[in-house]
Amino acid sequence: MNISIIIPTYNVQDYIAKCLESIATQTYTDGVECLVIDDCGTDNSIAVAEQFIADYSGPIPFQIIHHEQNKGVSAARNTGIRQAKGKYLYFIDPDDWMTNDCLEKMMNMATKYPTANLIQGNTFCNSKWARLEGKKLPAFSDDRKWIKKKFLTLNYLPTTCWNKLIKREFVVDNGLFFKEGFLHEDEMWQWGLSKTVRAIAFLLDKTYHYTILRPSGIMDTMTKKKDHFLFFVLELWVEDIDDFCKDEQIAYIFEKIRRITPNIETEEDWEHTERLLNTLSAKSKKSKRIALRIFQKSPRHLQSIRLWGSVISKLLK
């Protein structure tokens, strides 16, 4: 088996057929399997998938794997990793879809650069973070320091697991399973990826359509909830900083803090923020300059953060 496509599925009845159709019509089908992970949603997503599979008569085997209860997207992806038989894994979200030549182009890159642990694809998306154009990326790199720095430069490489063709053996050997119960599972996974990838190739052709479907009100609520979880992720990150690109990693964490501070609502999160800022300030002689440079991008953030009165005075000393 060459490629295992993994689709974590939960309450996407209006979209999953299009996702499955994009897989069924791939120009590359040699040794491809598709695993639909049923994460026990409350709509007809799985019924739609079952009907699609029943009507399909092509060469790609589709399999639905059922969870006994809802466990979340991380657990669904982990189930897919464990059940996959392919040399490569390809994650796709059920409300997204691929161009019909996606796997063919991915496998062409994998064949051309066999030492690459992963092939990073390009995406049809309005957001800069998911796109590769304009970033002067090579077709291939095995410079581990360069790879790590690029992964940890904000908005340079996509933090998501989807639209990456990645060797299953590499994922398993490095324990790159998804942290279950965390809402920032992609960023947690990306941090681990940055520290283990030895070689990477880039497919600059756009082959993946990313969709944002949820209403803005729901997204606002989710953002606040995710920001709360991000504090726990950041606390793990500050204890796992590499000397050779310390400043890049510190800047990455400071930038994350800057972006979530407007959503801080609880005493616990204020304490997390103060603890993170103080820890980072002690990590490097350049931490103070890095923090000031980043937070000066948005003066309103400084004014809204009560703890910055004391922290800024420390940074300016």
Predicted regions and their residues:
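A conserved acidic beta->alpha catalytic loop
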Residues: 22, 38-48, 69
